[in-house]
Amino acid sequence: MFLFYFSITLAIFSSALYHFTAKSTPSNVNFTVSLLVTYAVAFVVVLLTFIFFPIKNGLAFELKQLNWASIGLAIAVVGIEFGFLLTYRAGWHLGIAAVLTNVVASLILVPVAIFFFKEKISWVNILGILVCLAGLVMLNWKR
């Protein structure tokens, strides 16, 4: 049960930190240099996680277990990084951009979850989707 709550808490706080730091990245810095430093630090942090999640069967064995998803995740992460750096440089507000992208991405993933992962959707879920759509309209309403 600890992992259930810890994992979502980590994701929430990391996402908030991510958007805060992306918005705080100087607008005059080169995107590539910024992300190069980001990924170098991330590499070190990931290496440190071996303390908590040690390799049990050897690195070669673990590498053989990987599939296309690791490459896809890398491409997605770079797209997210560049996308948000550009979004914030273009003048989007922190709260609006984060909510908009997460809600729209979630809406895109609903059919993916249903058709590729055979997840079920209830009427309550459908109502939640409609609330999300209403929220998007309200977020982008001209003031």
Explain the meaning of each model-derived region.
Residues W92-V99:
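The feature identifies polytopic integral membrane transport proteins across all domains of life
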Residues K23, L85, A113-I114:
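Small-residue-mediated transmembrane helix hinge/kink sites in multi-pass secondary transporters
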Residues I12, A16, F20, L47, ...:
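Hydrophobic/small/kink-forming positions within alpha-helical transmembrane segments
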Residues M1-F13, S27-T32, V37-I71, E81-A90, ...:
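Membrane-interface interhelical linkers
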Residues V124-N140:
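Hydrophobic transmembrane alpha-helices of multi-pass small-molecule transport proteins
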Residues T9-F13, A40, I71-I75, V99, ...:
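Residue-level signature of the transmembrane alpha-helical core
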Residues S106-W123:
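C-terminal transmembrane-helix exit sites in multi-pass transporters
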